[in-house]
């Protein structure tokens, strides 16, 4: 499975919507490629200008982690570029954007302009039209690679994203609460003891989170012999 970020063009080809799928590793390079494909679609419709909106509805509930603002984690939103980092790092602490979704949309707008498309007005948040067609897609690295990066770098942003992807896959809302329910239920199915444990978030940064020695031992044993 890979997390998809898409660009959807309205039926009248007047509005382009950047739709976040929950990929915190989305890069400016990926947005450049998407902008090029979107520009091609607009030219096929004889359009050289477009309104730009951005859709973060994949996630619900609070955006700010309980410890936010904090250099260890960005606002948890379905759309961001490079984990909302304000520098060129890809791991460790860093100053974070207060509006990663809006920043991603503005970056996409700049790439559209470079591709020859005039973006009218400022990008605004709105859901994609139900009749809009997808004109560009970027897919993340496989989930296995995201898990490896999370564990190697202790990456809080990807950890939160993975928790929400679990929630989505299990029919829960992609929120802190939905992720908690999904993760807890999946551990129960694996017969991992969850008594006295509390998964307050996906990253473990919330001080209300608790795990027990029994849970950790059972989880490590299961991982060693799946």
At which residue positions do the language-model features occur?
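Active-site-adjacent loops and short helices of periplasmic peptidoglycan-processing enzymes
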Residues: 1-103, 114-148, 152-156
